[in-house]
Amino acid sequence: MIPLFKVFMSEDVIKPVNEVLMSGQITQGPQVELFETALKDFMGNPYILTLNSATAGLTLALRLLKNKDDRFQWPGFDEDTDIVLTPALTCFATTAAVLANHVKIRWLDVDLNTANIDLVDLKNKLSAHTKVIYLVHWGGNPVDLDGLRELQEYSLQKFGFRPMIVEDCAHAFGAEYNGSKIGGKASEGNICVFSLQAIKHLTTGDGGFITLPNEFLYDRCKLLRWYGIDRDKRNYKGKDLRLENDILEYGYKFHMNDINATLGLYNLPHMNDLLRKNRENAAYFDEQLKDVKGIQLMNTNTKCNSAYWLYTIRVLNGKKQEFMEKMKESGIMTSQVHNRNDINSCVKDFQEPLPNLDLLERELVCIPVGWWLSEDDIRSIIKNCHIN
């Protein structure tokens, strides 16, 4: 079976991971600091913190935004009256993070051409209570961030504030917009959260990281990821940091450990080659599948350089299930990857019409595109897309 996903693990990790395991320092320590420094260099952003999952980062992001902060002109967030706009087509982690903060949800419909959020629908749902917008870069293909910034300005003129953007970048490690990395300059002013789970481009076994737009949120997030305690030993002059803290604001146990960080540190140097291979495969599929009857390819904005964690197609004319079954018979794994979140019982109070998603879920299929595909695999995928 040609897999839809595959774990990338560098052979370079074996010796350093063993050294960490035998060092006596396996929780958050020097390897976490080294990994964060490497990520800051790769992303071009000095405000990066590693975490034990992207779910933790998405939860922290909204928690950080509840407090008013005049230092970056943020009005704060009232969980009794304010709402979060969030996509329904995503991993449930996105939705779980909003629910964990006890905040009301309004679902955003999808753009049929990208599977990203529909900016027209978003504009129609902006209100005086829309303080935060979550988005997902579906498959690694960035959302139209310029269009999104125009809507932030629209909100400023109409309601007196710019909604804060939280980018769920679980699919989008290495993606670029206007020549800059998502999570770096391309995402200026936004909070971004990345997944380092097993099957992502960059993996730490499990984990994630968050990028912050300013020093104020960075410093506060650094506290909240470990109970609200300052772990910087330089501030304690030899005293026990566990005993010398007055916790001003409670936090969580969301930090990364040195074992996971070491995996990330030694996998990171391979990412540019991995991304290049995924993009080459995707470009070849674009050319070979563009005229296949019954299949519609997704659009990529010319400003975007997708990470291609997924290669998504639309199978038309009610043939989705038949197509997926025949691909399976031919030894090719396909999937929708994520189910729509709005149908779950725990969010039944927030349901509303999403006509584009109703259509797209009947057509959306992801086919293998990754760095692991051989030339024979690629030929088989293309051949079977034509046949099926």
Predicted regions and their residues:
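Short beta-strand-to-turn element immediately C-terminal to the catalytic PLP-Schiff-base lysine
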Residues: 194-195, 208-213, 265
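Conserved active-site segment immediately N-terminal to the catalytic lysine
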Residues: 160-204, 219, 243-248, 296
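PLP-dependent aminotransferase class I/II
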Residues: 32-38, 42-49, 55, 120, ...
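Short, conserved catalytic or interaction motifs in soluble domains
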Residues: 110, 198, 369
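PLP-dependent aminotransferase-like
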Residues: 67-172, 176
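N-terminal "arm"/small-domain region of PLP-dependent enzymes with the aminotransferase-like
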Residues: 1-26, 30, 246-248, 368
